[in-house]
């Protein structure tokens, strides 16, 4: 009550923020008349003027009013679009490094031109991040016209570009691209062998479109660059064949003489927990699997991998559904994004799950992959000096944005009042009743000509509904992951009179639904069908389409605008709001309603008990619908439960990934330092000194006479690392202590290294140090990532031993990292001290071979091995081409 009173007096935080920005809007508006009198050249020259003023010490904040006024004028001249006052506020919020929540149709794409123009003045680059290649290309061409007019260069990063094209795009003033491409480019850069091969610049300022989709929905999926392992794929087929023979059971609670008075009994061969997305073998199931696979003990350490594959095969059959979680296209299993309904080619589930699903569907099984480089979107975007974002729905996740990204959300008012009533949910007992009601409403609205957008949560449901409409003879379009090529075309026409469109999740579709249809899209489509027509004919047809759409627009408005019909609530309220948000844009009329049933996943898994009780209490019969505030509240509570659960998963992921992130930063910084080559000799000498100190410490025991030290062990270790034996006269030996032993060894090691430098020359020795360091770091880092994966898998079990798994993970991951750094040091020192003079072509061949051993993602899509150059393959027992004098298998072929 007190907080409500305070809010009434001083306004909410959002209201105070908007109040602070309105005077700056006034400043920009006051500049408009003067700016509009400038010629095109004078307007363009303003960019150079701003750069000079910034160079002389003026801040971007002081340049903002004039820069925004210039950008607004360019928009009017080039695109015929003038930024509204609320769009200026949106631009200021983005410039401040915050999230601007702007409703659908409020022109987020145009808003981004303001802060991107202002921040491009620094010359440090601006990244505008979108969810797919289509939007990246469209926005760079469309909005890029404003920036090009003002003398700035615009680049675009999309799938299929080579490194030269990528570098050129990143060097532009403003770069449009997808989150995946930006992330993969970062990982690929940190696998390269020369700084000049890097494509990205420093991380200055990013504007993330559909920020909730990228930073929240996709945050659970890390970006991974991987190479295939050599494991056999037969095991997946063998295990897949036994899963249909297992019987699904359930968990039964029985009364028992226990503390709680109850105990759980498991029936069948396995049980499924849909909330936790897990499937577990019962005791009976374990015995049955052992019998079917002819193994004695499934939990024997030798068969632990088989147990893992059985569990993954169970999940594949019990939890992952065709046309819901994935599709099979051209003999390949492709993941469907659960939030946007888009296909995600190139993405694979890890840990053998993807292979289990491939076996289930009877398609070719690809080998499991080993991680070579990985990063989460959370940690990638936190590298930017300044980060901001736009979306139609961020306020529900404001707490998460603040906690994880330190980003505040500002809700921007709409330019025109929202006229869309959102009707209460209608709930039925069964899905069949619900779908019958949906069909009846669609039939009724279609008959009077009102356009309808029907939202479903999976491909399977969209096709089921489409079949029901087909039987009723109602013409309709279907938009799901299978028809994504026609996406923009279908969405653009969804507002036409009498149009019925069925769509899976509408998140991030990026195309406005215009009432009466989109004349521009219709013209483009007509031109594609009639490529031979003259420009004159095309202009004439375009004018006809325009006239037709204006007429239809008025008719559709009089019918009530676009009606949104949701057929199921999503786990996230945000996705529901995004579906609703497709209607009522820019003051247009519209309406929305959700039809639900107790058999829907959300209600069945998270809220059915409470809702069922309410329906029983209200004595709802089959076939009868209910609209009640209590039900709506129960559904929203179920959604909040799921959202909180998903937030915990993401927070858990980032807590674990933060450990890896610090290690990744150390390794990548070390690689960059080596590639820069300025301190490479000093780094190597430091490694040598550390190795000597470790040897002295390991063999020279403080309180034991020097004559009793393990001299043979020391001599062998020194020989292994540095290539010489320790030969100390007995009289000298007696006077030694750990400190002067270290000095003695250091002196001898420096002498041997100086001889190497004299023999090879400074240039060649530095080159060899660089090549060998990179080779060791990359090989050891790859193995370290595998060790970390294994550590993650088993760390949860520490909880049973009364230990905090997170703390144990941090401790052990740190120890693994330190062990890896020790191995890198030993490997580098040993190889340099053992290296022999080799011909220049041998060194080049070694470098080439080292590059070929790596696997890189081709444009962020699928892993492909680089084509090997034509050269003789080195046998494992042949001398190593690096010139170390060792066999290849004991040197670079390890």
From Swiss-Prot:
Cofactor note: May bind 1 zinc ion per subunit.
Cofactor (UniProt): Zn(2+)
Region (Disordered): 854-894
UniProt-listed Enzyme Commission number(s): 7.4.2.8
Membrane topology value: Peripheral membrane protein
Catalysed reactions, as listed in the record: ATP + H2O + cellular proteinSide 1 = ADP + phosphate + cellular proteinSide 2
Compartments it resides in: Cell inner membrane; Cytoplasm
GO terms under biological process: intracellular protein transmembrane transport; protein import; protein targeting; protein transport by the Sec complex
Leader peptide range in chain numbering: none
Binding residues annotated for Zn(2+), in chain numbering: 880, 882, 891-892
Listed Pfam families: P-loop_SecA (PF21090), SEC-C (PF02810), SecA_DEAD (PF07517), SecA_PP_bind (PF01043), SecA_SW (PF07516)
Subunit text: Monomer and homodimer. Part of the essential Sec protein translocation apparatus which comprises SecA, SecYEG and auxiliary proteins SecDF-YajC and YidC.
NCBIfam families in UniProt: PRK12904.1 (NF009538), secA (TIGR00963)
Function: Part of the Sec protein translocase complex. Interacts with the SecYEG preprotein conducting channel. Has a central role in coupling the hydrolysis of ATP to the transfer of proteins into and across the cell membrane, serving as an ATP-driven molecular motor driving the stepwise translocation of polypeptide chains across the membrane.
UniProt-recorded name of the protein: Protein translocase subunit SecA
The organism of origin for this protein: Geotalea daltonii (strain DSM 22248 / JCM 15807 / FRC-32) (Geobacter daltonii)
